[in-house]
Amino acid sequence: MEPERKGLSLASSSDGDGREENKLKQGISQDLASSSRLDRYKIARQLTEKAIKEKKIFSIYGHYPVVRAALRRKGWVEKKFHFLPKVIPDVEDEGARVNDDTCAKVKENQEMALEKTDNIHDVMSRLVKNEMPYLLWTIKRDIIDYHSLTYDQMLNHYAKTASFTTKIGLCVNMRSLPWYVPANPDSFFPRCYSLCTESEQQEFLEDFRRTMASSILKWVVSHQSCSRSSRSKPRDQREEAGSSDLSSRQDAENAEAKLRGLPGQLVDIACKVCQAYLGQLEHEDIDTSADAVEDLTEAEWEDLTQQYYSLVHGDAFISNSRNYFSQCQALLNRITSVNPQTDIDGLRNIWIIKPAAKSRGRDIVCMDRVEEILELAAADHPLSRDNKWVVQKYIETPLLICDTKFDIRQWFLVTDWNPLTIWFYKESYLRFSTQRFSLDKLDSAIHLCNNAVQKYLKNDVGRSPLLPAHNMWTSTRFQEYLQRQGRGAVWGSVIYPSMKKAIAHAMKVAQDHVEPRKNSFELYGADFVLGRDFRPWLIEINSSPTMHPSTPVTAQLCAQVQEDTIKVAVDRSCDIGNFELLWRQPVVEPPPFSGSDLCVAGVSVRRARRQVLPVCNLKASASLLDAQPLKARGPSAMPDPAQGPPSPALQRDLGLKEEKGLPLALLAPLRGAAESGGAAQPTRTKAAGKVELPACPCRHVDSQAPNTGVPVAQPAKSWDPNQLNAHPLEPVLRGLKTAEGALRPPPGGKGEGTVCSRLPHHGHHVAACQTTGTTWDGGPGVCFLRQLLASELPMGPGLPRDPRAPPCLVCRGLLPPAGPCKRCRSFCAAVLQGASFVRLGGRSCSPRTP
C-alpha cells in the first residue's frame, strides 16, 4: 500500500509541475501578445494621425477589393460603418434556459471574431470612426446624398447622367449631335426610337416600311448576283462538280417551283417608295403639294408587308427579278451614298427591343415583324408605359470570328464636365456569344453577348475550338488575330480611333445635362459592335460597369483599370497607367469684373435745414396727404353757429364746379346734432387756457376707414386787415423746401404731426400747415378742406388781386378784396403771392380772438 501511495504522490506532484509550466508559458505568450498588440496600436495610431492630417480617409460601399487594397497601399485609411462580424445574439425565450456550454461557445466565438478583426487596418478604421471620409467609392450614386457633400469630398459618380447612361437618354441625345459637332450620328449609332409616344411609333413604322422596301431591292440584287456567280464559274469547275451540282441544282429548281411566285409589281412599289425617300432627303418634296404625293394606302402597305415576309423567309420568290436588276442596283447605290446604315440593315429587317433604363441584357428581345413590336409596346398599361421600351435597328451584318458574334467593352473616365475632360483606356476586351451566329433564330443566346446572359449558357458543340471556353479575349489577343488575317492595321486606323470619336461625340452632347460637380469622377463602360467593314457601332454606355473577375481576362483588366483610375482621379500624378487623354475642352476664361469702374467715391454735401414755424394750426391725420381730388362736392358748408343758417348766396356758391389740378382733397361728412334734426350747439371746453370745440369728422376720399376727427382752428369774429404784415418772399422760399405731402413734427408737439403741402395754382405756391390747437364741430354738411390758394385768403393792402379768385376753402363763398372771409371767418393761413409773404393772425401765427 505504501509504494502505491508514494507513486500516487509522485504522479500528483509531476502533474502539478506540468500545470505550473503551462501557466507560465501561457503568461509569457499573453505578455508577448499584449506587447505586440500595443506596438501594433501605436503604429496604427501614428498612421491614422498622418492620414487624418493629409485628409486620406475613404469609405467604400460595394465589392471593390482592388480599390480598397490600392488605397491602403497609398496611405489611405478606411472608415467602416459595420466592420465587426455578426455574432449570435444573446436572446432567451421565456421558460427556456441556456446551459453553460452554449454560453461558453458564444463567448469563444466572439473572442475569435475579435481576434480575426484585430489587424492594423481594423484598428485604424476604429480610430477614424468619427472622422469625415474624403473619398467615397460606391456602386450607386443614390446611396450618397449628393448635395450634402463638402467641396473636399470626392465621389466616384456624377449626378444627372441618365442622358447617356440609359438607352432612352442616349437615343434622344444622339439626335441633337449636329447642333454640337459637325457629325452625323447615323454613322456610328444605330437609329433608335422610343415606343412610348404615338409620334415616335409613327416614325418607327415609316422607318420599318422604308427599310422593307430597300430590303426588297437587296433581295433582287443578291439573288441575281448569286445566279450570275454560279454561271460565271469555269467549265472545268462545273464538270468537276459532277452529278452533285446537278442534283443540287435540280433540288433548287424543284424547291423554287413549289414556292409562291410574286409579281414584279412588288419591285415596282419598292422602287417607288425608295425614290420618294430619296426625294425627301434631297428636299424635293418641299415644292410638291401634299395632294400630288401618291402615297400607299394602309391596305396596300399591309399587302406589301405580307409579301415581303414571304420573300425574306423563303416562302416566295420574284419570277422575273432579273428584269429589275439594273434599276434596283442604281437605287441602292443612291441610298447607300446618303444613308450610312444601309450596309447593317440586311434583308430581314430585324429590330432589337430593349427596356429604356435596364442593363445586363434584361428583357431584351429581337423581332422582325412590325405588328408584334407595336403590340409589345401597346401591351403595357398606359400609365406605366412612359419611357419603357426602346426599339433600335439590329446590326444584321456584324463582323464574325469563327462564325460567332462578339462585342467590345471599352472603358473611359470623365474627371470633369466643365471643362469637359475625358480619358480613354487603351485596353479593352471582347465578349463572345456561346452560339453560332444565325438570323434564322432570334434567340438572345445568339444575338446578345452580355456576360450576364452568356454565363448561364453552355457553349455550342459545333463552335470553333479556337474560341476560348470563357468566351473572352483581350484587345491584344484580337489584334494578333487581325494580324494573322492580314488586317493588322485595321485596329489602329479604323477601330480604335472610331471608338474614341464616338465617345467624344456622345459626351459633348450630354455635357449640358450632367451636373458638373468638382472633385468627382466616374468610370463608364461603352459597348461596341463591329460591322463587316470593321467600323464600330456604339450600342450603349453603362454607368458603374461590372468589375467582377468572372474570367481570367476580367480578373486582369478590371483590376488594372481600377488602379489606373485611382492614379488619374485620386493621385493626380504623372503616372496615368493605360489611360490617355481623349479630350480636354479649352478653358473659357471668365470676363474680368469691371464693377469697380462704376463706383462713385466722395462725400455728399450736407445743407443746413431751416426751421420754419407753421403759420396756421390745423389738426389733421397723416392719411389725408394721400387723398385724391374730389369727384363730387359736398351738399353743405360749415356755417358759423353764432350767425345762423347760411345765406342764399352760400347756397349758390355750393353749386360752383371744382377746379382741376389741386393735389389735396379732404372730404369728411359732418355728423352733428343738426343731422338728427336738432340744432348744432358748439361745446366749449377750457383746457390749458385754450378753447376747444368737438372735432369735425373727416374721411379719406378712397378709403372705407371709419371717420376721424380733423381739428380746425376757430378764428375770431373781428379781423383787422391793417395788422397784416408783408415780408419779402425770397428768404421764405429758401426755408420752404419741404416735399409735397411730407409730415414733420411741429416744434414742441408730442405725438401729433404737421401736414405741409405746396399747392400750385395759377402760378402761386401756398404752404398750408396744420398743428394742434383748437378743434371745431360744424353743423350738417361736409367740411371741404380741399384747396389752399393764394387768391382765396385775405390780402394786405396794395397787393394785386387775381380776377379768377376761387371761393373760400370752408364755406365756398367768394372772398372779399381784402381780409378774411366775412361769412365763416374760420380759416387762417400763410399766403405767398408775387414777391411778398403775407402773414395773417399777427406775429404769433395764431388765430385772432375777439
Curated annotation (Swiss-Prot):
The gene is TTLL8. This is Protein monoglycylase TTLL8. Residues 1-29, 228-254, 627-652 are annotated as: Disordered. One of its GO terms (molecular function) is protein-glycine ligase activity. Residues 222-580 form the TTL domain. Its EC number is 6.3.2.-. ATP binds at residues 354, 360-361, 392-395, 405-407, 449-450, 540. The keyword Glycosyltransferase does not apply. Keywords: ATP-binding, Cell projection, Cilium, Cytoplasm, Cytoskeleton, Flagellum, Ligase, Magnesium, Metal-binding, Microtubule, Nucleotide-binding. Gene3D superfamilies: ATP-grasp fold, B domain. The record marks 360 as: Essential for specifying initiation versus elongation step of the glycylase activity. Two conserved structural elements specific among monoglycylases, IS1 and IS2, are involved in glycyl chains initiation. Two conserved structural interfaces likely constitute the binding platforms for tubulin tail and microtubule. GO terms for biological process: axoneme assembly; flagellated sperm motility; protein polyglycylation; spermatogenesis. It comes from Homo sapiens (Human). Mg(2+) 2 binds at residues 540, 542. Its main location: cytoplasm.
